[in-house]
Structure formats: structure tokens, C-alpha cells
């Protein structure tokens, strides 16, 4: 037994299906199938943990408010106290290019509401939730705040954002760097051919808009891939590349596909099996009348098969010259990647 069989003979997802939500930059559902039994839970849990804890993003580290010495103060003419203002600042979502720390400022006079959209940013910082309310100013009130923005990962508590030489009036803020806000997943049964014992992994991802959900999942998968490399203690034997000579066929290679690989109901599949219909090439040569004479084969099964064939550009009653070929089993194996 070659060592490659340990991973090469496991089934792998055909593709990742991404369905965007109401806002494609923030919401999406991703489906991967089929997976080996148990892999849905394994991959879903690992990806969820990495998505929430390990992706890089930008956030406010600290704020300096003119005339304020500490976060337990109040500001004349400002309805919220400083503690509430700091909590609102923590919810500012940012996208930043390059390295930090960087500065951004907001200055406003009342009456009115100060929002994240009022913040003056440099060119490589974008406020992603400009409607977020920071504080409310009464008539004649004025406020000026200077924010320190940096990049990081996961969640960093305010205490860790306080530098040792912090000036008086610098208020550290809890930093939520992760661009991912919510992740959930579920694992269901799925089928591959006639086998139902596989996993289907469905992930629902919400971001703050700094990353699209599918990019976030891609980065999380890359992190896991990089972390797992240290456990691989061998080099794979190099595969000799030989140019395979593909014979010319007098018919569509899809005819070499076995009918049990089609996603048919159990009843329809059993009827075909009982009638010794093994390959699609056997099936398409049958007429509708011939199919309806098959025991236990009804109009519902006929319509199901016609629909599946139509999706492949095929139909019943076709003429297939040169069918069946003498070496049909060998040809089916050689052409399995071509249909």
C-alpha cells in the first residue's frame, strides 16, 4: 500500500458553492459537499474558530477627547457620558491598508449627532459603518476626539492597549480586530451516486465588510493549511508524468458514465439495474416505449430520467454507432475525467 492512499482515496468536495446574502460584501452561505463522514464537523469547527480568532483587521486602540482626563468623566453639553462614548467607539468598523498605528480625528459642534461618518480619515482608512452613532451634542456643545487605529487579530482588551508611557487623557479601547462578526455551521447527510453516507457542510458567515465572507473562509483555510504543515514529516514521491494517449471515440465520452452515478431515485436506479442498463450509452438508445415496458417503471421515473439526460444534452432514442465497444470497462476508466 502506498502512503498516498491515506489521503488520495478520501472523497473531496467537488466545489464550494457560495450564495451571497442581501449584502454580498457582508453576508454569504457556503456549501461544501461531499465530505467523508465526520469531516463536516471537523472542518466546520476548525474554520469557525479560525474565522473568529485569527483573521487580521483594523480597529480603534485608544481615543483622546479634548478636556477629558479619564473615561469616568462627563462632558458639558454631551448627553452620553464618556463610558458610553467609549463603548460606541468600540463598535466602529474599519478597513485599513498598510501598517499602523494611524490617526483619525472627529470635530463637531452641536446641536446634532456625532456619527462614525463624521470622522476625518486619511486615504487608506475607510469607515465601514458611517451611520454608527457615537454621541449627541446639545446646542453650543463642541467635541474633538483623536483616535489611534492599528491592525491586529482577534480581540484585545483595553488594558493591553494602554502603553506604559501613556499621556494623561489617553483612554484605551477594547479592540475587535476580526473582520468576521458571526459564523455558524451545520452538517447534513448528502449523497454521491447511490451512497448516502457523506457529509454536507453549510457555513453562514457575516463580516463587517472589510472582507467578503468567501475571502474570509479562504484566508481561514490557508491559516489552517499553514499550521498543519509542521505535522507532515515526509516528502511525497514525485509522480512521473506520462502523456496518456486518449483514443478517438465514435461516440460521446459521456456514454461511458455508469447510470448508478446519476442522481436518480432509488426506484428508478433499481429499475435500470434490473433491466441490465449499466452505462448511459445503454440508456440513451432506449425509446420511451421500451422504458415504460420495464417492470415497475412508470411515467414518474421516465420523466426523472429524461430530465437528468436533458441536463447533459442527451435524450432517449439516440443512435450510438460503435456501441458497445469491446473494451468498455477499460475505456470507462480512462475517460472518467472527461465527462
Curated annotation (Swiss-Prot):
This is DNA-directed RNA polymerase subunit alpha. The gene is rpoA. It comes from the Bacteria. GO terms for biological process: DNA-templated transcription. One of its GO terms (molecular function) is DNA-directed RNA polymerase activity. It catalyses: RNA(n) + a ribonucleoside 5'-triphosphate = RNA(n+1) + diphosphate. Residues 1-235 are annotated as: Alpha N-terminal domain (alpha-NTD). InterPro entries: DNA-dir_RNA_pol_insert (IPR011262), DNA-dir_RNA_pol_RpoA/D/Rpb3 (IPR011263), DNA-dir_RpoA (IPR011773), RBP11-like (IPR036603), RNAP_asu_C (IPR011260), RNApol_insert_sf (IPR036643). Residues 251-339 are annotated as: Alpha C-terminal domain (alpha-CTD). SUPFAM superfamilies: C-terminal domain of RNA polymerase alpha subunit, Insert subdomain of RNA polymerase alpha subunit, RBP11-like subunits of RNA polymerase.
Amino acid at each position: 500500500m502506498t502512503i498516498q492512499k491515506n489521503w488520495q482515496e478520501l472523497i473531496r468536495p467537488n466545489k464550494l458553492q457560495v450564495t451571497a446574502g442581501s449584502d454580498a460584501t457582508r453576508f454569504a452561505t457556503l456549501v461544501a459537499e461531499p465530505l467523508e463522514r465526520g469531516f463536516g464537523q471537523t472542518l466546520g469547527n476548525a474554520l469557525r474558530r479560525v474565522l473568529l480568532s485569527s483573521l487580521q483587521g483594523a480597529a480603534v486602540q485608544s481615543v483622546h477627547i479634548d478636556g477629558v482626563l479619564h473615561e469616568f468623566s462627563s462632558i458639558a453639553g454631551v448627553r452620553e457620558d464618556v463610558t458610553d462614548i467609549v463603548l460606541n467607539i468600540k463598535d466602529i468598523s474599519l478597513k485599513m491598508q498598510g501598517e499602523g498605528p494611524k490617526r483619525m480625528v472627529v470635530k463637531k459642534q452641536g446641536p446634532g449627532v456625532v456619527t462614525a461618518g463624521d470622522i476625518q480619515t486619511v486615504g487608506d482608512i475607510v469607515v465601514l459603518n458611517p451611520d454608527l452613532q457615537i454621541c449627541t451634542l446639545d446646542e453650543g456643545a463642541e467635541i474633538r476626539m483623536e483616535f489611534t487605529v492599528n491592525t491586529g487579530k482577534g480581540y484585545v482588551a483595553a488594558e493591553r492597549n494602554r502603553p506604559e508611557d501613556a499621556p494623561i487623557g489617553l483612554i484605551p479601547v477594547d479592540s475587535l480586530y476580526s473582520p468576521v462578526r458571526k459564523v455558524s455551521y451545520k452538517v447534513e447527510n448528502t449523497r454521491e451516486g447511490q451512497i448516502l453516507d457523506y457529509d454536507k457542510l453549510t457555513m453562514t458567515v457575516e463580516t463587517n465588510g472589510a472582507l467578503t465572507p468567501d475571502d474570509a473562509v479562504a484566508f481561514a483555510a490557508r491559516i489552517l493549511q499553514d499550521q498543519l504543515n509542521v505535522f507532515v514529516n515526509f516528502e511525497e514521491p514525485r509522480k512521473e508524468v506520462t502523456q496518456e494517449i486518449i483514443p478517438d471515440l465514435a461516440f460521446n465520452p459521456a456514454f461511458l458514465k455508469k447510470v448508478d452515478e446519476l442522481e436518480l431515485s432509488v426506484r428508478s436506479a433499481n429499475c435500470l439495474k434490473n433491466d441490465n442498463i449499466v452505462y448511459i450509452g445503454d440508456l440513451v438508445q432506449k425509446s420511451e416505449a421500451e422504458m415504460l415496458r420495464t417492470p415497475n417503471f412508470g411515467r414518474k421515473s421516465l420523466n426523472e430520467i429524461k430530465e437528468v439526460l436533458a441536463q447533459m444534452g442527451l435524450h432517449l432514442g439516440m443512435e450510438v454507432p460503435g456501441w458497445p465497444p469491446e473494451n468498455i470497462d477499460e475505456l470507462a476508466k480512462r475517460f472518467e475525467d472527461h465527462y
